[in-house]
UniProtKB/Swiss-Prot annotation:
One Pfam family in the UniProt entry: DcrB
Function: Plays an essential role in toxin Tse6 delivery to target cells and specifically in the loading of Tse6 onto VgrG1a.
InterPro entries in alphabetical order: DcrB/EagT6 (IPR014894), Mog1/PsbP_a/b/a-sand (IPR016123)
UniProt organism field: Pseudomonas aeruginosa (strain ATCC 15692 / DSM 22644 / CIP 104116 / JCM 14847 / LMG 12228 / 1C / PRS 101 / PAO1)
Lineage: Bacteria, Pseudomonadati, Pseudomonadota, Gammaproteobacteria, Pseudomonadales
Lineage top rank: taxon: Bacteria
Coiled coil: none
Subunit field text: Homodimer. Two dimers interact with Tse6; this interaction is crucial for Tse6 loading onto VgrG1a.
Protein's UniProt name: Effector EagT6
Amino acid sequence: MTLYRLHEADLEIPDAWQDQSINIFKLPASGPAREASFVISRDASQGDAPFADYVARQLENAEKQLPGFKLHKRWDINIHGHAAVLLDYQWQREGRDLMLRQVFIERRPAVLITTLTTTPADLPHHEPAWKQAMQTLVPRPTPS
């Protein structure tokens, strides 16, 4: 059994279970900007592939699947000793432009992903809160 820690509780789960949990936070409207979302998810699909290949595959899938996809930024970064990649891109849903800022953090057995979803015009209004949250993100060691 493995200890699993939630914000509200701790529990033990069988070792064979795979964590696919998602944490969703709503950012309040800020000035003229509408609400945004900040999501933390886990993805075990990296497998044995190099992290760069995993990120390239994720980017390729987004490009194929998201209408009006446009990549704005791709930065290789390091978060407390973990390889990470920041992607800023936009796409269209129901005729509306959406802006995503994703950070992929290598942490086996699952990549940790943070996603800020807003609009291109609203990003500057939500960016300070996003930066503040991300500066406090410290990946925990992988349980043995």
